[in-house]
Design a protein with these regions (language model features):
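N-terminal, polar/charged subdomain of small-to-medium soluble alpha/beta proteins
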Residues: 1-129
Length: 129
């Protein structure tokens, strides 16, 4: 969802950047057998006005709980594609937080097995209600 289509009350975000976990995702046998590091960025759009006024954790996105959910997915059952990992994370964030209207999830695979030099390979998805 582009910023031009968001309602004026969903421009607030909760961001989690650079979450690092060890998982066994990939197409190659070595990736699923040995595993590797994955780096996750997640942004969740939600009106934070009520949380700002109430100072109550129940009125916002609990990033400790979100971190644990993301960790469980990345460290959980192997997937062939990081696109699948990103989809599961996005679905989890939307399911766990009814106030979240949109999520953006990036999954980076910094140690991809390619013949060549690169910093990272990754995908970014955006999902909205």
């Amino acid at each position: 969802m582009s910023s031009s289509t968001r309602s004026p009350y969903t421009g607030d975000t909760v961001r989690m950047e650079g979450l690092e976990f060890y998982g066994h995702h990939g197409v190659l046998a070595a990736e699923t057998d040995l595993g590797q590091r994955f780096v996750i960025d997640a942004t969740m759009w939600s009106c934070l006005r009520k949380a700002g006024a109430s100072d109550d954790l129940g009125d916002t996105v609990d990033y400790t709980r979100s971190y644990e959910s993301i960790r469980d997915i990345v460290e959980g059952p192997p997937r062939k594609l990081i696109e699948s990992v990103a989809e599961e994370i996005a679905a989890s964030m939307l399911a766990d937080y009814p106030r979240v209207t949109e999520v953006r999830v990036s999954v980076h695979k910094p140690n991809v097995a390619l013949r060549g030099t690169l910093r990272t390979v990754g995908v970014t998805i955006e999902r909205a209600r």
